[in-house]
């Protein structure tokens, strides 16, 4: 029985994680979780799973729930996330919060000796050098929840990582993959949130459309697998059936295929190196796909991906700037303050004005993050 701590329980990844826990009560127990603003959903999770500790974002929600569930310990805010992440009785932390707010709880959980299943890619983007060093010192493996990185992990099982020629991350191309740059000037939030293959949260769906999401995944792969940026390639795979591939020095490829269902990588992170069956509505049959299509990425069409590669290669605090600027720009788009077409421009503006600080400590990363957010907000 693995005792699970789940950060971001009411989001897309969190909700699907709860499905896995619900379907495997003999394998998993939810002992602590966090949620943001959806108190009705949070209340329902408490009633169903009966956790010992819960973190909410707002003080008023903590006060409300404390009166309803006197046997549960409640915390709120970032401090609450950090308390829950290190809950003594938890075995595994699955971090599914969105944004750089997930960094400190992850570092705390590593220090506390928890196994880490990481869906919060911003943690590695902003502080990969600190996180990987901390995990190494504690002899803790970070198991990826992203479908692409889970695919790479599976492709590398039993392989010598020194024999990697290239990591190939696949991308659907997002909701606007067939539109020109000129056509993007008129797109709406509603249109942007229609992903062709995956069911994801709003922020992630927009990031998929710009391909900032794939850029963050490139940086994540760099840290998780120790591969240089020049040896990480992104290709468009329209069907989202091939989740990613590894090319080896002998020219062979190992790929992981499967239905575009996030339960698969989530469950694999929780059961690694074991596997459990998953009840699908429709069985995946490879013969249903008479052809799989692969295309090179047009970096003029998707400048966000080029910005991400540049930020990763520059290193230091530049990935923090890219991530923080993108979070504010996407929030501005979702709130109607920014045109979709201008998301990349805002990020590029923030990067151009920043001089990267090499090998930053945690305080520097947090300071740069806040300064970048404040600056981009002035541009909305």
Curated annotation (Swiss-Prot):
The family database entries (InterPro entries) matched by this protein are listed as: DXP_reductoisomerase, DXP_reductoisomerase_C, DXP_reductoisomerase_N, DXPR_C, DXPR_C_sf, NAD(P)-bd_dom_sf
Name the enzyme group at the top EC level: oxidoreductase
Pathway annotation: Isoprenoid biosynthesis; isopentenyl diphosphate biosynthesis via DXP pathway; isopentenyl diphosphate from 1-deoxy-D-xylulose 5-phosphate: step 1/6
Q: Which Gene3D superfamilies match?
A: 1.10.1740.10, NAD(P)-binding Rossmann-like Domain (3.40.50.720)
Q: Does the keyword Transcription regulation apply?
A: no
Swiss-Prot/TrEMBL keywords = Isoprene biosynthesis, Manganese, Metal-binding, NADP, Oxidoreductase
Q: Which PANTHER family has this protein been placed in? A: 1-DEOXY-D-XYLULOSE 5-PHOSPHATE REDUCTOISOMERASE (PTHR30525), 1-DEOXY-D-XYLULOSE 5-PHOSPHATE REDUCTOISOMERASE, CHLOROPLASTIC (PTHR30525:SF0)
Q: What does this protein do?
A: Catalyzes the NADPH-dependent rearrangement and reduction of 1-deoxy-D-xylulose-5-phosphate (DXP) to 2-C-methyl-D-erythritol 4-phosphate (MEP).
From the Swiss-Prot or TrEMBL record, give the protein name.
1-deoxy-D-xylulose 5-phosphate reductoisomerase
């Amino acid at each position: 029985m693995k005792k699970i701590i789940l950060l971001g329980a009411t989001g897309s990844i969190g909700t699907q994680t709860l499905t896995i826990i619900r379907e495997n009560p003999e394998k998993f127990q939810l002992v602590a979780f966090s949620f943001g603003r959806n108190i009705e959903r949070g209340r329902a999770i408490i009633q169903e799973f009966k956790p010992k500790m819960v973190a909410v974002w707002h003080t008023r929600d903590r006060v409300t729930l404390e009166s309803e569930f006197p046997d549960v310990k409640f915390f709120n805010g970032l401090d609450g996330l950090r308390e829950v992440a290190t809950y003594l009785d938890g075995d595994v932390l699955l971090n599914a919060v969105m944004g750089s707010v997930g960094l400190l709880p992850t570092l705390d959980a590593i220090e506390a000796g928890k196994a880490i299943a990481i869906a919060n890619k911003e943690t590695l983007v902003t502080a990969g050098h600190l996180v990987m060093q901390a995990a190494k010192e504690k002899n803790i493996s970070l198991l990826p929840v992203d479908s692409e990185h889970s695919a790479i992990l599976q492709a590398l099982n039993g392989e010598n990582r020194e024999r990697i020629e290239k990591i190939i991350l696949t991308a659907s191309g997002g909701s606007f993959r067939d539109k020109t740059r000129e056509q993007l000037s008129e797109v709406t939030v509603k249109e942007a949130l229609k992903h062709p293959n995956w069911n994801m949260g709003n922020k992630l769906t927009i990031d998929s459309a710009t391909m900032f999401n794939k850029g963050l995944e490139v940086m994540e792969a760099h840290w998780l697998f120790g591969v240089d940026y020049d040896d990480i390639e992104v290709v468009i795979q329209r069907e989202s059936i091939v989740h990613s591939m590894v090319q080896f020095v002998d020219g062979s490829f190992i790929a992981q295929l499967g239905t575009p269902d996030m339960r698969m990588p989530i469950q694999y992170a929780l059961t690694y190196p074991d596997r459990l069956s998953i009840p699908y509505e429709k069985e995946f049959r490879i013969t249903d796909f008479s052809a799989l299509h692969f295309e090179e990425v047009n970096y003029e069409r998707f400048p966000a991906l080029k910005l991400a590669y540049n930020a990763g290669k520059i290193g230091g605090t530049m990935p923090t700037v890219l991530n923080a600027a993108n979070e504010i720009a996407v929030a501005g788009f979702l709130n109607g303050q920014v045109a979709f077409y201008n998301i990349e421009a805002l990020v590029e503006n923030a990067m151009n004005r920043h001089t990267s600080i090499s090998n930053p400590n945690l305080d520097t990363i947090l300071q740069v993050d806040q300064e970048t957010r404040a600056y981009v907000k002035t541009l909305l």
